Design a protein with these regions (language model features):
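Feature of Fe-S/electron-transfer and energy-metabolism proteins
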Residues: 1-172
């Protein structure tokens, strides 16, 4: 750095060819099709809600928005809040210029986005989720609509999901 500041020529001989990140921000393929979705969803909606929150808290999972707020705490606060109607909101506005993480998730991982919303709805006691997707992302809207329709056709979204008393619907 000192050489750069002085304006001297720098001989660059070292290149890093591997990542030193402690975690991967890319999602795995465990929810890439409807059969996997159904199996995992069935396990979750037959699990005690407090156990799911404890697992979230223990995992230290945080949101992708940059604030680093623990997801388990957020879900626990929502679950304990008394309200006649609760909503799960996915704000995929992506207001930061040059940011495409929301678009990537919506277009390439729509089942994972919807899975998170459905499980959140189960845990906090909500029967409705709303996604805000900016109009400049028509492919994102198309991908999410397609995933919503597929889930409804398979009985994985809507009334009495997988034969349980849990109902959840999604709107864009």
């Amino acid at each position: 750095i000192d050489d750069i500041i002085k304006g001297e020529k720098i001989e660059q001989k070292k290149f890093f060819s591997k990542s030193f990140a402690s975690t991967s921000f890319l999602m795995d393929d465990k929810l890439s099709n409807l059969d996997q979705f159904k199996d995992i969803l069935s396990k979750f909606i037959n699990t005690d809600k407090q156990e799911i929150i404890k697992s979230l808290l223990d995992s230290n999972l945080t949101g992708r928005g940059g604030a680093g707020f623990p997801a388990g705490m957020k879900w626990d606060f929502c679950r304990k809040t008394k309200s006649e109607k609760k909503y799960v909101i996915c704000n995929a506005d992506e207001g930061d210029s040059g940011a495409f993480s929301d678009r990537y998730l919506l277009e390439d991982q729509p089942l994972k986005v919807l899975f998170g919303m459905i499980i959140c709805g189960y845990v906090i006691g909500s029967d409705e989720g709303v996604l805000y997707i900016r109009g400049e992302y028509p492919k994102s809207i198309e991908a999410i609509n397609g995933a919503i329709n597929s889930l409804k056709e398979e009985g994985l979204l809507g009334e009495n999901i997988l034969g349980t008393s849990f109902s959840f619907d999604l709107n864009i």
